[in-house]
């Protein structure tokens, strides 16, 4: 603290975000020192020190940075001219089409990934868990490209990587070894994909993945689109191995997990109770025309849950714009959520509670947290969600983001 013009000022905060309403509460000022929130105090009570950067909040709603827990930042044509949808439908058809065209589009590369990350940042996402393709044609090149892209943003986005075998594991000899190499090289997680429908060997695929996790201490994040009893059986196989190996809570995630909503209520309750007890998490991209994962049941069972954009504007689908708040809206709307407590809970998933998929740190508007702050012209979190309010300002890792500089048209 110091005196300036006869008043006590804070000389630690290098940036002060003035007159905002954290989570829609009372007006406050937020002091930022380096990349951390230093303090949160009633608005107007602590003038900024001379030379401090000031962000005029004008009474806007303040939320923690958005968290994208299931992304594919390596494989978009964002920033390129329109690419017409081609190839066959279904998982196998999309895999084949992607492999036929990705090289001509520069997928993967650092420029591709950086364009995607910049769009995430423009809409307020500051933490990302991204799946990155690992296969015999690419090796680990995609992971290197995504890491380079994140570094180019100089810490604005905190990112963790899932080495993802999009084309299968056992059906492509050598991929399991690539996943092992990725884990040894520092990939935080290793992925899997539909062990029965893709590899035709759920036990073999899962045993291979869990062996890598045991050897390297990495997490597992497994795409599981398989429906009904088949998918539920595979979730049981995953849970059996988590229990057998004593894997710590939060280290194993089931992405999509459509089977959870397909099975009858008693079977679903058993699955969720076991997942909650073992600390196995779930992520969803809130797919349209499908039943959504049951938030109230998952909360009751203690299953931690995150939201993600999936791929955006890519060779799988032209849809998607990278706005995690839009995915949160889609999840809430498709799930018929209208009560304040449910709408606010979805905003918490998209911000504060989603961060555990990327970091062990607290992610909130409190002292000590990384200074990731999003300002929106909204009455409260519920209003921000249902109107998908544009972001008025973004502070990422303590630095004010130049949103105008990031505002490029998707084809440029």
Cite the ranges covered by each PLM segment.
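C-terminal cap of metal-dependent C-N hydrolases
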Residues: 365-412
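His/Asp/Glu-enriched, well-ordered alpha-helical/loop segment
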Residues: 244-252, 296-378
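N-terminal metal-binding scaffold of metallo-dependent hydrolase/deaminase domains
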Residues: 1-49, 381
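Divalent metal-coordination and catalytic microenvironments
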Residues: 20, 35, 59, 70, ...
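Active-site core of metal-dependent hydrolases
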Residues: 156, 163-172, 184-293, 304, ...
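Alpha-helical scaffold segments that flank or form the walls of functional sites
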Residues: 77-131, 137-152, 177-184
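Active-site gating loops and adjacent loop-to-helix segments of metal-dependent hydrolytic enzymes
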Residues: 76-109, 234-253, 271, 321-338
């Amino acid at each position: 603290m110091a005196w300036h013009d006869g008043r006590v000022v804070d000389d630690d905060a290098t940036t002060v975000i003035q007159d905002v309403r954290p989570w829609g509460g009372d007006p406050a000022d937020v002091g930022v020192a380096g990349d951390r929130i230093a303090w949160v105090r009633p608005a107007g009570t602590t003038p900024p020190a001379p030379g401090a950067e000031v962000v005029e909040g004008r009474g806007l709603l303040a939320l923690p940075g958005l968290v994208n827990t299931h992304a594919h930042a390596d494989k978009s044509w964002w920033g390129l001219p329109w690419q017409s949808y081609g190839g066959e439908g279904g998982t196998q058809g999309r895999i084949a089409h992607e492999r036929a065209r990705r090289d001509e589009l520069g997928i993967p590369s650092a420029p591709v990934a950086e364009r995607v990350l910049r769009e995430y940042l423009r809409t307020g996402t500051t933490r990302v868990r991204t799946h990155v393709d690992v296969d015999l044609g690419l090796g680990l090149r995609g992971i290197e490209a995504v890491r380079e892209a994140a570094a180019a943003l100089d810490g604005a986005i905190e990112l963790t990587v899932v080495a993802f075998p999009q084309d299968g594991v056992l059906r492509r000899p050598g991929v399991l070894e690539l996943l092992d190499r990725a884990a040894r090289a520092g990939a935080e997680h290793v992925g899997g994909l539909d062990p029965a429908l893709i590899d035709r060997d759920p036990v073999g695929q899962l045993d291979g993945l869990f062996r890598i996790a045991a050897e390297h201490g990495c997490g597992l994040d497994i795409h599981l689109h398989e429906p009904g009893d088949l998918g539920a059986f595979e979730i049981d196989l995953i849970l059996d191995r988590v229990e057998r190996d004593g894997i710590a809570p939060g280290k194993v995630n089931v992405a999509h997990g459509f089977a959870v909503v397909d099975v009858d209520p008693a079977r679903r309750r058993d699955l969720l109770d076991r997942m909650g007890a073992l600390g196995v998490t779930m992520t969803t991209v809130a797919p349209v025309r499908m039943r959504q994962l049951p938030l109230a049941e998952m909360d009751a069972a203690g299953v931690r849950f995150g939201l993600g954009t999936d791929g955006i504007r890519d060779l799988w689908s032209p849809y998607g714009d990278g706005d995690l708040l839009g995915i949160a809206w889609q999840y809430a709307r498709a799930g018929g959520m209208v009560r304040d407590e449910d709408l606010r809970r979805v905003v918490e998933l998209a911000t504060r509670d989603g961060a555990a998929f990327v970091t062990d740190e607290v992610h909130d508007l409190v002292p000590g947290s990384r200074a990731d702050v999003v300002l929106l012209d909204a009455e409260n979190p519920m209003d921000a969600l249902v109107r998908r309010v544009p972001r008025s300002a973004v502070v990422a890792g303590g630095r004010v983001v130049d949103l105008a500089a990031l505002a490029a048209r998707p084809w440029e």
